[in-house]
């Protein structure tokens, strides 16, 4: 029986064949650019894609809070193979195929946050809304995909992007840089999107105690859960809102990591207590 890990490894083995089939020769320049494949699409030459990838990688390393650069890095490094692998993972799953057919979007217009807040505290919907409120964020902050040529694959990237906050909610990881790096490490093992793996290098920007905590607590957690968990891109989150969140975690093989905000709060209290005793 295939495991989540073996399925993802099998995808790597088909890299050469997939790239040969799907990489399109793009004979255009700045003065001869083809028409976009979907609203908002910006076709890129290989040189442009490479420059954007390098620039966004350096920029996001210097400032991990630049969501626009992280989004650009995600798009420019996902082709020609990785976004197709993720799309194929959806095509091989009944729920994934339904998501591709329905093309749902996750915004404050498609989800009723007041309703989610009214659900029992143990539900997925309440957990998601409570996480948004706790972190002070909105589902409307995800930028639209621009640099992926294939229209269906562009939706796959958009879906991943809009589901990201659900990953935060079910793991409990906050949006601070330390929490984002931990979640990106988990996402890399689950999705194989290069940007998520490259984001781990931002750990060099953490304070020494944060970096030590990442290596000793959250990276081992990310490896365990990322390899064991099912493909999260195939979760129809809109249909899970009234489910028990712990049951869903168990079904997806997601281990909840230690609460990062609680860890940081206790450390601050310990430091204050130590200063008072001096």
From Swiss-Prot:
Q: Where in the cell is it found?
A: Mitochondrion inner membrane
Which cofactor names does the annotation list? Zn(2+)
- Give a Gene Ontology cellular component term annotated to this protein: extrinsic component of mitochondrial inner membrane
Q: Where does Zn(2+) bind?
A: 164-165, 168, 180
Q: Which GO terms describe its biological process?
A: ubiquinone biosynthetic process
Instruction: Give the Enzyme Commission number.
Output: 4.1.1.130
Q: Does the keyword Transit peptide apply?
A: yes
> How the protein sits in the membrane?
Peripheral membrane protein
Name of the featured protein: Ubiquinone biosynthesis protein COQ4, mitochondrial
Describe the subunit structure.
Component of a multi-subunit COQ enzyme complex, composed of at least COQ3, COQ4, COQ5, COQ6, COQ7 and COQ9.
Catalysed transformations (reactions):
a 4-hydroxy-3-methoxy-5-(all-trans-polyprenyl)benzoate + H(+) = a 2-methoxy-6-(all-trans-polyprenyl)phenol + CO2
Give the similarity note: Belongs to the COQ4 family.
Task: Describe its function.
Answer: Lyase that catalyzes the C1-decarboxylation of 4-hydroxy-3-methoxy-5-(all-trans-polyprenyl)benzoic acid into 2-methoxy-6-(all-trans-polyprenyl)phenol during ubiquinone biosynthesis.
Q: Which UniProt keywords apply?
A: Lyase, Membrane, Metal-binding, Mitochondrion, Mitochondrion inner membrane, Transit peptide, Ubiquinone biosynthesis, Zinc
Question: Transit peptide residues?
Answer: 1-28
Q: In which pathway does it act?
A: Cofactor biosynthesis; ubiquinone biosynthesis
């Amino acid at each position: 029986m295939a495991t989540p890990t073996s399925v993802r490894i099998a995808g790597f083995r088909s890299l050469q064949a997939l790239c040969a089939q799907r990489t399109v020769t793009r004979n255009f320049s700045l003065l001869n650019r083809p028409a976009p494949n979907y609203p908002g699409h910006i076709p890129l030459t290989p040189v442009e894609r490479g420059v954007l990838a390098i620039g966004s990688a350096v920029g996001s390393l210097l400032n991990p809070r630049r969501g626009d650069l992280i989004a650009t890095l995600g798009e420019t490094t996902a082709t020609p193979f990785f976004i197709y692998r993720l799309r194929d993972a959806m095509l091989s799953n009944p729920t994934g195929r339904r998501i591709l057919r329905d093309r749902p979007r996750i915004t404050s217009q498609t989800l009723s946050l007041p309703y989610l807040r009214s659900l029992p505290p143990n539900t997925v919907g309440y957990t998601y809304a409570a996480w948004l409120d706790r972190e002070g964020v909105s589902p409307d902050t995800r930028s639209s995909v621009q640099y992926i040529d294939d229209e269906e694959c562009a939706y796959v990237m958009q879906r991943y992007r809009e589901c990201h906050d659900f990953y935060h909610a079910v793991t409990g990881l906050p949006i601070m840089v330390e929490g984002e790096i931990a979640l990106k490490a988990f996402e890399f093992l689950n999705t194989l999107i290069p940007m998520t793996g490259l984001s781990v290098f931002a750990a060099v920007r953490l304070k020494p105690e944060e970096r030590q905590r990442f290596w000793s607590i959250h990276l081992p957690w990310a490896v365990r859960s990322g390899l064991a968990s099912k493909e999260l891109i195939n979760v129809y989150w809109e249909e899970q809102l009234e489910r028990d969140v712990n049951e869903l975690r168990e079904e997806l093989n997601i281990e909840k990591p230690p609460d990062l905000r609680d860890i940081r709060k206790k450390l601050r209290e310990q430091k204050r207590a130590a200063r008072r005793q001096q």
